[in-house]
Structures are given as structure tokens and as C-alpha cells.
């Protein structure tokens, strides 16, 4: 996946998802271009 920033935290960009993939330890997310930054 593409990296992205959620505030000052580096995350992974997921295209066209309504929630972050489960089981990967994500603690939060930000809205990002047509998807989420998790």
C-alpha cells in the first residue's frame, strides 16, 4: 500500500474501504482521498 500521514503518524493508505482491515493492529484512521489512511 501507499504510505500516508494521519496527523504526525505514518500510516498505510487503503483505497475505497469504509474501515481499516481488521487484525493488523490499527489504532485509528483518517479520511484520505477516496479511502482511509490507517
Curated annotation (Swiss-Prot):
InterPro entries: BDS_K_chnl_tox, Myo_ane_neurotoxin_sf. One of its GO terms (molecular function) is ion channel inhibitor activity. It comes from the Eukaryota. The keyword Secreted applies. It is found in: Secreted; Nematocyst. The keyword Disulfide bond applies. GO terms for cellular component: extracellular region; nematocyst. Disulfide bonds join 4-37, 6-30, 20-38. Keywords: Disulfide bond, Ion channel impairing toxin, Nematocyst, Neurotoxin, Secreted, Toxin, Voltage-gated sodium channel impairing toxin. Possible modulator of crustacean voltage-gated sodium channels (Nav). Despite this toxin having similarity to members of a potassium channel toxin family, the effect seen on crab leg nerve was similar to that of sodium channel toxins. Belongs to the sea anemone type 3 (BDS) potassium channel toxin family. This is Toxin Bcg III 31.16.
Amino acid at each position: 500500500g501507499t504510505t500516508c500521514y494521519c496527523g504526525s503518524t505514518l500510516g498505510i493508505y487503503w483505497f475505497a474501504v469504509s474501515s481499516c482491515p481488521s487484525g493488523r493492529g490499527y489504532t485509528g484512521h483518517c479520511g484520505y482521498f477516496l479511502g482511509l489512511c490507517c
